Each structure stands twice: as structure tokens, then as C-alpha cells.
Regions:
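Signature of multi-pass transmembrane helix bundles
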Residues: 1-53, 93-302, 310-312, 355-363, ...
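Hydrophobic transmembrane alpha-helix bundles
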Residues: 56-59, 73-74, 92-93, 183-189, ...
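Membrane helical hairpin/interfacial module
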Residues: 45, 49-96
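Mid-membrane cores of alpha-helical transmembrane segments in multi-pass membrane proteins
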Residues: 71-77, 97-103, 122-130, 150-153, ...
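A short glycine-/small-residue-rich loop at the edge of a beta-strand within enzyme catalytic domains
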Residues: 58, 82-83, 265, 269, ...
Length: 466
């Protein structure tokens, strides 16, 4: 059975998800041609996103490597990037069974009415496998690994329910969809607290600029396309050791700028493919459940945050944070992690932050900045345990994507930089008995609160409809 799940996971998101969505579509009553088209569009979306992400990584890579060499930015933790982190997570004993375990937990929570999210974003289950894997290798106990993964899953489902109304209101065409992805959800506490603090600053409301406001105020210069070109050229220039080298490298500098601009322009177009493919599945699933089960109003289908990473504010803020993050990684005392490969996944910080800031570019930037500063220290602290897992997987599989260069430890912003990952790890591993007890109380408390909240909302709606 373990080999079966490893084979399915090994297909990759671009193959696994179209198959799953096609089968799911047929099972819920969609005709095969329409279900197949939906599945294939999802697959095309994943391929397109992979191509654009690879373009971003391959374009930035040489310039960033030169910056590291010129300015002596050597740090001790090698950035694996989220694809390698996912490969490590899924190739452990926890990862091999994470999908059926989490689906079982999801079903149990639906039956007990402690969630209304049906999480079909199976590829992103690797996040739960990740926290489970590092706890497993740290404690040498697979049961604690599954415990950590399950706790993370329960908390994430409740968070998805709690944030669903604001998410659906902020983003277009997202009715009935929630985001049960722990990396995105882990930044919600940062966003709520910092957003309220910023609102208390006199005059800060005058900086209420969203992506449309940038376009109106700065015209072409406020477009993500133009900002991508400018920042790309800036990074390319910083990768030169002298003015003469800058002049000699003008073609490559301009080329990097155009490629960065292309990434900013292509990502929204690619995310539209996800929406086109997933909407029929989402709508049909909600209709079927509404017919079969009473009191199913408000049900949400758990989808990938890739649906909304093309929002202009996300693109602009992510782009601005790339050079800032590199600078901070170098100057922050005690940090040993230099993010390079992880920068391509910067977009995934913001899907759940934007509904809280209402798309405000300044607020989103500040929240992202604080989250990244804290996240760099989280990655640094968890690197040793992630390295244990990566080395074990490499020894077993020989997969070069999980190989850590000699003399380095391994790390990745996604998922190691999140408060949820760091907190669950230390409460499970460092505090032994009292920590797991706290997590059980927290997870059960959130689930019970969620049930009470949803029951009250149902009662209010019933009264309003009379």
C-alpha cells in the first residue's frame, strides 16, 4: 500500500491532480468530456505555473549567485525550495500515508460538523507530511510524526472555515471555495495583529493604496509588468562587480528584466486556467452535497492557493520583497538561511493576507516583511531536523532534488518559515507531554468553537429566512 501511494504522489501535481479531478468530476455527476476538460485545464495550470516558476528561478539564479559571490553572502543553510521540501515530505513513512489519513480526518470532522471544508487539494497535503516528517526524524517516533501532521490538519481545516467568508468576498469568482493550505493560513495571525496595529497609527489610512490605486497614481510604472522589469534589471545590475561589468552586461540585465516582467504578466493568465478548470468541479460538488445532505449550506471546497496568486497586489508585494528578503537574510544576527530557490514561492505568503488588508499594498508589504523576518529564524532553527529527513530520503531514493551539498544544512521558506510548523514542532518535540496536551486542547477547542459558530450562524440564517 505504501508503494501505491508513493507511486501516485510520484506522478507529480501536473499528472496526479488532473486524474483526481477527472475521476471526481465523473463521480459527482459531471459528464466525462466536461470532467476530463476540467481535469486537463488543472493539469495545464500546474504545468504553466511550473514553467513560469522555473523561468523565475533560472533567470534569478545566476544573478543571485553572483551577488552571493561578490558580496560574500555565504550562509550555512542551503535553500532547497518548496519542490524539494515536498519531495522530502512525501518520500518519508509519514508522507506515504498522509493522504488517506487526512481524508479520514476530514470525513470525521464533516460528520461531527466541526468543519465545512471538503479538502480536495491533495497535492498540498505535503505540508502536513512535512511537519510530520521532521517531528518523526527528531523524535525517532512515527506516532508523534502522525500526531503532529493530524494536529496541523485539524487546525488548518478550522482556519479555512474561519477565513472562507473574507476570502470569498475579496476575490472574484471564489464563492464556495476555501484555502486549507497551512502555509497560507499560518500568516493570518500576523496579518490580523499587524493590520490592527497599523490602523491605530494616525494618518496611516492615507496610505490606503491597492493595486488599482498604484495604476491610477503611477500609470504604467504601477503595473506589475513594469515593476517586474525594473526590479529584474536592478537585481541584474547588483550582480555585477563594477560599472564596466554593468555596461558589458546590459543585454543580460535587460533580458532578466523582461523575464521578470513576463513572470508578473503570465501568472494571472495561468491562474485563470485553474479557475476555469476547478469551478465546474466545485459547483457540482456543492450541488451534490446540498441534495444528499441536509444542513449542508455554507459548505466550502478546499482548493489550492494557486487560484489567486495572480492578484496584482500579491505580485507587486512579492516582487518588492525579493531583494529586501535577501538583504535581511544577510544582516539579521543569528540567521543562517539565505533564500534563493524559495523566492519563487514568495507569492504563496499573501493569498490569506490580502482579504485582511483589503489588498492594501503598504499593509501587505509590512505584514509580509514581519512574517519573513520571523520566518528566517524559524527556518534556521528547524534546518537540522529537515536535514536529517532529507539525507534519509536521499539515501533511500537517490533523488538529486533532495540532495544537500556537503558542508550545508537544508531548509526552505515553505513550509519551515511558518508559525504553525514551528509551533507544532516544538510543542510536540521539545515540550514532550505538556506540549502535545496543549496541542490536543487547542485543536479540539478550535474544532468545537467552529461547530458552535457554524450552528449559531445557521440559526440566524434560518430566522432571517422566515
Amino acid at each position: 500500500m505504501e508503494e501505491v501511494f508513493k507511486y501516485i504522489i510520484g506522478l507529480g501535481a501536473e499528472v496526479m491532480m488532473p486524474i483526481i479531478f477527472t475521476i471526481l468530476g465523473v463521480c459527482i455527476g459531471i459528464k466525462l468530456p466536461k470532467a476530463l476538460k476540467s481535469g486537463l485545464l488543472v493539469g495545464v495550470g500546474f504545468v504553466g505555473l511550473s514553467v513560469v516558476t522555473a523561468l523565475l528561478t533560472s533567470s534569478l539564479g545566476p544573478a543571485l549567485s553572483k551577488m552571493v559571490e561578490i558580496y560574500g553572502l555565504e550562509l550555512g543553510i542551503f535553500d532547497m525550495g518548496w519542490p524539494s521540501a515536498a519531495a522530502v515530505a512525501y518520500n518519508t513513512s509519514v508522507g506515504a500515508f498522509i493522504i488517506p489519513v487526512c481524508l479520514g480526518i476530514n470525513l470525521l470532522m464533516l460528520l461531527t460538523k466541526t468543519t465545512r471544508t471538503v479538502n480536495i487539494d491533495l497535492w498540498n497535503y505535503w505540508h502536513f507530511a512535512f511537519i510530520g516528517a521532521i517531528v518523526y526524524f527528531a523524535s525517532d517516533n512515527i506516532y508523534w510524526g502522525f500526531f503532529a501532521a493530524i494536529i496541523c490538519y485539524i487546525i488548518t481545516l478550522v482556519m479555512a472555515d474561519l477565513t472562507a467568508p473574507a476570502f470569498q468576498k475579496f476575490y472574484d469568482k471564489m464563492d464556495g471555495i476555501s484555502i486549507p493550505q497551512p502555509f497560507c493560513q499560518s500568516f493570518v495571525p500576523f496579518a490580523i495583529v499587524i493590520n490592527k496595529l497599523l490602523d491605530k497609527i494616525p494618518g496611516f489610512d492615507k496610505l490606503n493604496i491597492d493595486s488599482e490605486g498604484l495604476k491610477k497614481k503611477f500609470g504604467l510604472m504601477g503595473e506589475p509588468l513594469f515593476l517586474g522589469i525594473v526590479i529584474g534589471c536592478g537585481i541584474g545590475a547588483l550582480g555585477c562587480g563594477s560599472w564596466k561589468e554593468v555596461v558589458d552586461s546590459i543585454p543580460s540585465i535587460l533580458g532578466l528584466g523582461i523575464k521578470m516582467g513576463a513572470v508578473m504578466e503570465l501568472i494571472p493568465r495561468i491562474t485563470s486556467l485553474f479557475i476555469e478548470g476547478l469551478k465546474p468541479i466545485s459547483d457540482a460538488t456543492r450541488e451534490l452535497i446540498a441534495k444528499k445532505y441536509k444542513n449542508s449550506a455554507g459548505l466550502s471546497i478546499g482548493m489550492s492557493p494557486a487560484l489567486v496568486i495572480g492578484h496584482p497586489t500579491t505580485l507587486v508585494v512579492s516582487l518588492l520583497l525579493i531583494p529586501v528578503t535577501i538583504f535581511l537574510a544577510v544582516i539579521l544576527p543569528g540567521n543562517r538561511f539565505l533564500p534563493l530557490a524559495s523566492l519563487a514561492g514568495m507569492f504563496y505568503l499573501f493569498p490569506m493576507i490580502l482579504p485582511i488588508t483589503k489588498g492594501n499594498v503598504v499593509k501587505s508589504f509590512i505584514i509580509g516583511l514581519v512574517a519573513l523576518i520571523v520566518g528566517l529564524y524559524f527556518v534556521t532553527e528547524l534546518a537540522g531536523f529537515f536535514t536529517l529527513a532529507a539525507k534519509d530520503v536521499y539515501a533511500a531514493t537517490g533523488d538529486p532534488t533532495v540532495n544537500i551539498p556537503a558542508g550545508f544544512e537544508g531548509g526552505a521558506l515553505d513550509f519551515a518559515s511558518s508559525l504553525l510548523c514551528w509551533g507544532i514542532f516544538h510543542l510536540t518535540y521539545s515540550l514532550k507531554i505538556i506540549g502535545p496536551a496543549i496541542l490536543v486542547v487547542l485543536a479540539l477547542g478550535m474544532a468545537i468553537y467552529n461547530r458552535i459558530r457554524m450552528t449559531r450562524n445557521d440559526a440566524k440564517e434560518a430566522l432571517n429566512n422566515k
